[in-house]
Regions:
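Extended, charged helical/alpha-beta scaffold domains that provide interaction surfaces
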Residues: 451, 458-482, 489
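Charged, surface-exposed helical/loop "interaction arms" that form contiguous linear patches used
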Residues: 360, 364, 374-377, 430-431, ...
Length: 881
């Protein structure tokens, strides 16, 4: 090597790094012949994530470079794995036919695939939207845009940071686009697990955003979409259009409209509520059952996605809800027609995503045929649904678009069973194009000719084993085994010698080969043109097809509600404008489906209003069903406010605008928050957002700290909701039996308990809600059921007896069975080996009596939460704690 010579990459590797420099944040898949390859650091990553071999490729003067790759036809298998692993992937294709390239083949990125910008079925959940979100901020306001490129759904919203947080929790975007530099703040506010991408500040400029959207929708103004009052939402939507351009997704014809999400039209449910109610995911991971898995009776992916959208954003519009109830009622009474409608809808498939692939020009021939089959089902569905005297149903059917011309063209143009792709077999039907038919005859006839030539040459030469074959190196050839090579005619031209045979060509063979191959090339060109014209026609019909998709999805959900009601004996709720919740014989929609054979769920009544019974203090044993009762109440309300019938004999519901739950908690270690801190944060958020139409479900508030602290906080919360909560209807489950006395103090507080029956040493859970409080938790019985060692059970029973005796001088030693004198502190509290806490309201110690007097003197009707905490702090100081 010459001294001082600069080592250079080969032209191919130079080109790779040149493209990589344009997309440094992405893994580059680089098309080389029949393979996609990655080099250098990308090769190491690709090998690790995909589990494929990492090897080396020659790189000129530099020796070798790391390489990993896979066959091009396997990209639909490997690309989704990279994206699911959290990587953006740049697909770099050959932009010219290598046969005609004079030097290095021209290449360029044809697509940048990210979690939020995907069309590949392997990356998409059939039953969920795949939202890409954009966020724009201005002081304490935030604008949001949610776009699903796989369906064309495009929505904008604007409001407080917390409100946008509820939308993020509800819609679960797979990727969020923000201004560069905002990544950390967004993750701190909305969650560390979010996938964040960035664009520059200019992408969020309002005027430019408006122009981008007008261009996308091909309109002169956005006024027709009624999004003018959401300027930050428009900025976010414009930024998403910039991001699509940067990821090589331009001119998507399925994105043809935009709508607004109005805060005052939907029920507020924060991420804690959605988690606690297990709407989409069970709290026990893959082992549990979510609400959606029980109620989803949809026959199509489009309906399943709409159902999830309704669950994420229940509505308050009574007229709209009654329209949904009317359709469900009709289907419920329709008998066999319901089954037929569901069968037709099931045959439609996922038209939304099929036409989205058509919008990109990447729709496969078999998907075009599925589109045709889907369109053919709309007419019989309409015939079954119209003219039944159901106004809501007739209105829906009247909005369906006539796509019969497109359907006719698809069915006439395509073969019944098309090949997977143009060039892989027949796609266009016979009779569509006379030139195509003629070329096909030449191609198929040419193959027949070759068979005849093989037979005639075998007879002429006497070489019985002669055969004509084809390969990519020198086309058609005649193969002769060595034992017959002496019989080869002199005009044959030898092309290849093998171990046991020789291969020859003839002038006649080459001439006919050229004719056949020319015909096949022309067939490919003609099929490509005709197919492209059909796809263009589909693209022109996208808005009409999208309208029909939305109607079919709605029918699918409502028909599913009817099946749910039929199978599980649900009844129509009555939605009102008053402030009353009256459920008769309500059941938990999930738990009742999991009951053992022969065992029925015990139904319960719930009544809440703003005048006499605003707050229910619910006590009862462990495992009695308090938490289930809380959840079932919220789930019945939720089902009613998405348009479903409910698991109850009857339900009269004054519509709710917010549903809050505080049920269970876990540590948030990543943020340094304990279980109790998480509990307090969630409860604080609830107390700050109460309204007269709020439904509040609180379960075991205060159990994450000491008994006195927890009980004091629980009591203060109940008092606050009663006095300052604007009449928010509340179910408060607790083991603090001392809270039962609140019924005597506050006019709208009522005590209830879950009944049990004691038979000897056994406890039978009756699961029935009864009036009045209870002072028994039966925790030891539950411990016995859990299989605790008998020594532990005996010790616990001894300790419980001692506590119930409330002997301030002696505590029974559970371990030794002997009487032990406790240690008395300066503040008069008792300490023992078990660190036991005695009842706070039966005292004979002067210090504790003083504290009791302080509590008795507190003006609970006027005290603020802050003053209550100050009082609690001073009491702790007096105790020397």
């Amino acid at each position: 090597m010459a001294k001082g010579k600069v080592l250079e990459d080969t032209p191919l590797i130079k080109q790779f790094f040149s493209v990589k420099a344009q997309h440094p944040e992405a893994v580059l898949l680089y098309r080389v012949g029949d393979f996609y390859e990655s080099y250098s650091d990308d090769a190491v990553l690709v090998s690790k994530v995909l589990g494929i071999v990492q090897t080396k490729k020659s790189n000129g003067d530099k020796g070798y470079i790391e390489m990993a790759g896979f066959p091009h036809h396997a990209i639909d298998v490997y690309l989704p794995k990279l994206v699911r692993a959290g990587y953006k992937v740049a697909v770099c294709d050959q932009l010219e036919d290598p046969k005609f390239a004079k030097k290095l083949v021209k290449r360029g990125v044809t697509e940048l695939v990210t979690p939020g910008v995907a069309f590949n079925d392997q990356l998409l959940d059939q039953k969920e939207n795949n939202f890409l979100a954009g966020l724009a901020f201005d002081k304490d306001q935030c604008g949001a845009a949610f776009l699903d490129v796989s369906t064309g759904s495009f929505q904008v919203a604007q409001g407080s940071l917390d409100y946008i947080g509820t939308l993020i929790a509800s819609l679960n975007p797979k990727e969020i686009v923000v201004q560069r530099g905002y990544e950390k703040g967004v993750k701190e506010k909305y969650g560390d697990n979010l996938y964040i991408s960035t664009v520059e500040e200019w992408a969020f400029v309002y005027d430019a955003a408006v122009e981008r959207l007008k261009k996308q929708f091909n309109v002169e103004s956005l006024k027709g979409f009624a999004v003018d009052s959401f300027p930050l939402g428009i900025c976010s939507a414009g930024a998403l259009m910039v991001y699509l351009e940067q990821t090589q997704h331009t001119g998507l014809k399925n994105i043809c409209s935009i709508s607004r999400i109005d805060e005052d039209k939907f029920v507020w449910m924060d991420k804690f509520t959605m988690r606690n109610l297990e709407i989409f995911n069970s709290s026990v991971g893959g082992e549990g059952v979510s609400l959606v898995s029980v109620i989803d009776k949809c026959s199509s992916p489009m309906g399943a996605r709409l159902l999830r959208s309704w669950l994420a954003m229940p509505i308050m519009d009574i007229k709209e809800l009654n329209s949904r109830y009317d359709v469900v009622q009709h289907f419920l009474e329709a008998g066999e027609d319901l089954d037929k409608v569901q069968e037709y809808i099931g045959n439609i498939g996922d038209l939304e995503r099929i036409i989205s692939r058509a919008a990109t020009g990447r729709i496969a021939p078999r998907e075009v045929m599925q589109l045709g089959r889907g369109l053919s089902q709309t007419e019989p569905i309409a015939a079954l649904c119209k003219d039944h005297g159901v106004k809501a149903l007739d209105s829906l059917i009247s909005k369906m678009k006539n796509c019969s011309k497109l359907l006719d063209r698809i069915m006439k143009t395509m073969t019944a069973e098309p090949a997977a792709a143009v060039g892989k077999g027949e796609v266009i039907a016979p009779g569509v194009d006379s030139d195509l038919d003629e070329l096909r005859n030449i191609s198929s006839g040419g193959k027949d000719y070759l068979l005849k030539l093989q037979q005639s040459e075998a007879e002429r030469t006497g070489i019985s084993s002669l055969k004509i074959s084809y390969n990519n190196v020198f086309g058609y050839y005649i193969e002769v085994r060595n034992s017959f090579k002496d019989l080869v005619p002199p005009e044959w031209i030898r092309k290849q010698t093998l171990v046991n045979a020789e291969r020859y060509i003839t002038q006649e063979l080459k001439e006919y080969e050229e004719k056949i191959l020319s015909a096949e090339d022309r067939i490919y060109a003609l099929e490509t043109r005709i197919y492209g014209e059909l796809v263009a026609e589909i693209q022109r019909n996208i808005p009409a097809i999208q309208t029909n998709c939305r109607i079919i999805a709605r029918l699918d959900v409502l028909a599913g509600f009817a099946q749910l009601a039929r199978d599980n004996h649900y009844n129509r709720p009555e939605m009102t404008k008053d402030l009353t919740l009256d459920i008769k014989a309500g059941r938990h929609p999930v738990i009742e489906t999991l009951m053992p054979a022969g065992e029925e769920y015990v139904p319960n009544d719930i009544f809440l209003d703003n005048k006499k019974q605003q707050i229910i203090i619910l006590t009862g044993p462990n495992m009695a069903g308090k938490s289930a009762l809380l959840r079932q109440t919220a789930l019945i309300v939720l089902l009613a406010q998405i348009g479903s019938f409910v698991p109850a004999d009857s339900a009269r519901i004054g519509y709710f605008d917010k549903i809050f739950t505080r049920v269970g908690a876990t540590d948030n270690i990543s943020r340094g928050e304990s279980t109790f801190m998480v509990e307090m944060l969630e409860t604080s958020m609830i107390l700050h957002n109460l309204s007269e139409r709020s439904l509040v479900l609180l379960d075991e508030i205060g159990r994450g700290t000491s008994t006195y602290d927890g009980m004091s906080i629980a009591r203060a919360i109940v008092e606050y909701i009663h006095e300052y909560g604007r009449g928010a209807k509340t179910l408060f489950a607790t083991h603090y039996h001392e809270l039962n006395d609140l019924e005597e103090i506050y006019s709208r507080v009522r005590n209830f308990h879950i009944a049990v029956k004691e038979v000897g040493s056994q406890v039978i859970f009756l699961r029935k809600l009864k009036e009045g409080g209870t002072a028994h938790s039966f925790g030891i019985h539950v411990a016995r059921m859990a299989g605790m060692p008998k020594e532990v059970i005996q010790s616990a029973e001894n300790t419980l007896k001692a506590l119930e005796m409330n002997d301030s001088q002696h505590i029974v030693s559970a371990r030794k069975g002997e009487i032990k004198k406790p240690v008395q502190t300066k503040a008069g509290t008792l300490e023992s080996d078990g660190s036991l806490q005695l009842s706070f309201f039966q005292l004979d110690d002067p210090t504790l009596e003083s504290l009791r007097d302080k509590l008795a003197g507190a003006d609970l009707n006027n005290i603020t939460p802050l003053q209550a905490f100050d009082l609690l702090r001073s009491m702790k100081d007096e105790l020397g704690l």
